[in-house]
Every structure is written in structure tokens, then in C-alpha cells.
Design a protein with these regions (language model features):
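Alpha-helical scaffolding flanking metal-ion-dependent phosphate/phosphodiester catalytic sites
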Residues: 106, 126-140, 158-169, 173-254, ...
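Residue-level signature of transmembrane alpha-helix interfaces in integral membrane proteins
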Residues: 150-151, 210, 233, 295
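Short alpha-helical linear motifs
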Residues: 89-93, 147-155, 185, 205-209, ...
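Residue-level signal for alpha-helical context at structural boundaries
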Residues: 61, 65, 72, 87-91, ...
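Acidic/His-rich, divalent-metal-binding segments that scaffold phosphate/diphosphate chemistry
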Residues: 20-161, 168, 172-175
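Terminal helices and disordered tails flanking the catalytic cores of nucleotide-processing hydrolases
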Residues: 1-59, 66, 231-331
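Short capping/connector residues at structural and topological boundaries
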Residues: 12, 150-151, 157, 197, ...
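Detector for Asparagine
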Residues: 49, 56, 61, 80, ...
Length: 331
């Protein structure tokens, strides 16, 4: 069982300080930048291939996935992980199966949050691969259940909740090297207060990677359309998680989640008390409720031809009254 104490931040820093070859490698690659659109496309293609293999009862090869994770981890450690990648994961629409996009989105979230947690390179890579493959067994759930628009009946819910065992079986079958992936996939729906499934585990009995991914998976699901419901805004999702789910998740991880994504993150749509609508273009750590905004709809509900910016730190009479989704804007 991997425990949270194994994800040692201090040990990570010591390792980087004393590993001259690693420091030299980072220095040589510091000018290399990750192309976010290309990486996202390749990650989706990899996941499509994995899910197709699993659907056909074949063993997937994880070599390409490990290389993809290495790329994004290196970018994170170099300090040039593109913010555009996070925006794509938060606000992009599913272009393929939602299982594919969800896996890639949660992976991106995990790398950003792992950076906040200051995980060492090896642990960050393990977290990334675990996030990418955490839902792999769900491809075996019948589509009439997985894509059902109405609420699931009890017997259908029972079928759905078997998929963590399928994920465990699939990943465990890849060998001892990937046991941590199998355990994480089995535990990702468990909750700190014992309210999760399939085993009703509590606290430290839950795999630490699964504890991180559990928060991010829920956030991703809430902020993207699903067959059963429309997505929430970032603000609504965060409020829901903090208000109703805080006992289900580790407090340290909820804090890291908020520090990673903020209250009004870049690119999110907000409505001011004046009635104007804008998009967040800059956040301020010291005043998270008062970001800089580019106005796109004026107070008379008319699209502006030339967007103007407002820094809410300098406009004390104005404040954010609501957070919106693209659907709200286009309604």
C-alpha cells in the first residue's frame, strides 16, 4: 500500500539537488516547450487505442502513454507547463468519446495539482499515468447504461459500480510494475469518510493517488456535459465540492485543489454587478475575488466590438455577481 507519507516533498527536493545529471538534463531542455494542442491530440489518440484494446479483451501497451506523461512532467519541472493546456482541459468540449477526453483532462489537472503539492518527479509521473488510466474499466460498462440520459435504476447503478474491479483486473494484468495503477483505479471512487465504493474504505486505507484523482475526477465531471446533465461553471462546481463533499476528501487536497485552480480561473466567464459579462484574463493571488477581466458583453447586454479590460482591484464599486458557462452566454 502506497501511503501519502511516501510522496515526500523534502526528499524530492534533496533528490533534485544532488542528482547532477537530472539538473543538467533540465537545463539543456529548458528552452523546449510543450505544444498543448499537439500533446492533447496525441494523448486522446493513445487513450482511444487503449480503450479499443480493453474493449476487445486485449492487453494495452503503455509505452506511448508513459512517454506522454514524461513530456508533461518534464514541462512542469522546467516551469514552462503551458497554461493553455489547463484551459483546454477545463473549457474544451469532448471531441471524441467522453471517456477519452475525461481521462486526458483529469491527467492534465493531476499534473498541475501535483505541481502545487510539490511532488517529486517519479511520483508526479506515477500520478499522471494513474490519472490517465483510472477509468479504463468503464469501457466495459454497457453503453445503454453509460450513456443513459435518465437517472439510473438501482440494478443499472449496481452494474456501473462494478467497473473499478474491471479496471483493477485490466491494470493488474499488465504486471507487478503497474500494481500501483491497479490499486489506484480500484480506490478512486472511495471517500475519506467511507461513503464511497466499491469497498467503503476510509482515510489512509485509500491509495494516495486515488485520493488526489477523486477530487479532480469529480471536478471534471461537474464542469463538462454528460448524458444525464449539463455542466456547471467552475465556480458552481468548486462551491458544490467544498459545501457538500468536504468530508469525502482530504482537507490538504481540497486546499491544494483551490490553490491550483483558484476561485475564478483564467478564461472563465463572469457577470459583474453592473450586468456586464467578461472573461478572466489575469488572476491576483492576494485578491482572488478581484481578477482582471476582458469585457465582452456590456451592461446593456450588447456584444462589444472592441473588448476593454477592467482590473477589479482598481474598481472597488464593481464585483463579480455570478459565474457563467458558454451555454449561459449563448442563451
Amino acid at each position: 500500500m502506497l501511503r501519502f507519507s511516501d510522496l515526500d516533498k523534502k526528499g524530492a527536493k534533496k533528490q533534485v539537488d544532488t542528482d547532477d545529471s537530472f539538473v543538467e538534463d533540465l537545463s539543456q531542455k529548458s528552452s523546449i516547450k510543450l505544444d498543448p494542442k499537439d500533446w492533447y491530440r496525441r494523448a486522446c489518440r493513445f487513450m482511444m487505442n487503449v480503450l479499443e484494446k480493453v474493449r476487445n479483451r486485449e492487453k494495452p501497451n503503455l509505452t506511448e502513454g508513459e512517454a506522454l506523461i514524461e513530456e508533461i512532467v518534464q514541462a512542469s519541472l522546467r516551469g514552462n507547463l503551458p497554461q493553455e493546456l489547463l484551459i483546454m482541459a477545463q473549457y474544451g468540449n469532448a471531441t471524441r468519446s467522453f471517456l477519452v477526453n475525461k481521462a486526458v483532462n483529469v491527467t492534465i489537472f493531476a499534473i498541475f495539482m501535483g505541481k502545487t503539492l510539490e511532488l517529486p518527479k517519479e511520483r508526479l509521473a506515477e500520478l499522471g499515468l494513474a490519472a490517465l488510466l483510472h477509468d479504463v474499466g468503464k469501457v466495459r460498462v454497457p453503453e445503454e447504461i453509460l450513456l443513459k440520459e435518465a437517472a439510473l435504476k438501482d440494478d443499472e447503478l449496481a452494474v456501473l459500480r462494478k467497473y473499478p474491479h474491471d479496471s483493477f483486473e485490466i491494470l493488474q494484468g499488465l504486471g507487478d510494475k503497474y500494481h500501483y495503477l491497479a490499486e489506484c483505479a480500484l480506490h478512486v471512487n472511495e471517500r475519506m469518510d467511507g461513503s464511497g465504493f466499491p469497498q467503503g474504505l476510509e482515510g489512509d486505507a485509500i491509495n494516495p493517488y486515488a485520493r488526489i484523482i477523486a477530487v479532480l475526477e469529480l471536478y471534471e465531471a461537474m464542469t463538462h456535459n454528460r448524458p444525464q446533465r449539463h455542466k456547471l461553471s467552475h465556480f458552481e462546481a468548486v462551491k458544490e465540492i467544498i459545501k457538500t463533499k468536504k468530508s469525502a476528501f482530504q482537507r490538504e487536497l481540497l486546499k491544494a485543489f483551490l490553490n491550483t485552480f483558484g476561485i475564478f480561473p483564467l478564461h472563465c466567464l463572469v457577470k459583474l454587478n453592473s450586468g456586464a459579462i467578461g472573461r478572466v484574463i489575469q488572476t491576483h493571488e492576494e485578491q482572488p475575488l478581484r481578477p482582471k477581466i476582458e469585457i465582452i458583453v456590456d451592461a446593456q447586454n450588447k456584444r462589444v466590438k472592441i473588448p476593454r479590460t477592467i482590473d477589479l482591484r482598481e474598481q472597488q464599486v464593481l464585483y463579480i455577481a455570478d459565474a457563467l458557462t458558454e451555454e449561459n452566454l449563448n442563451a
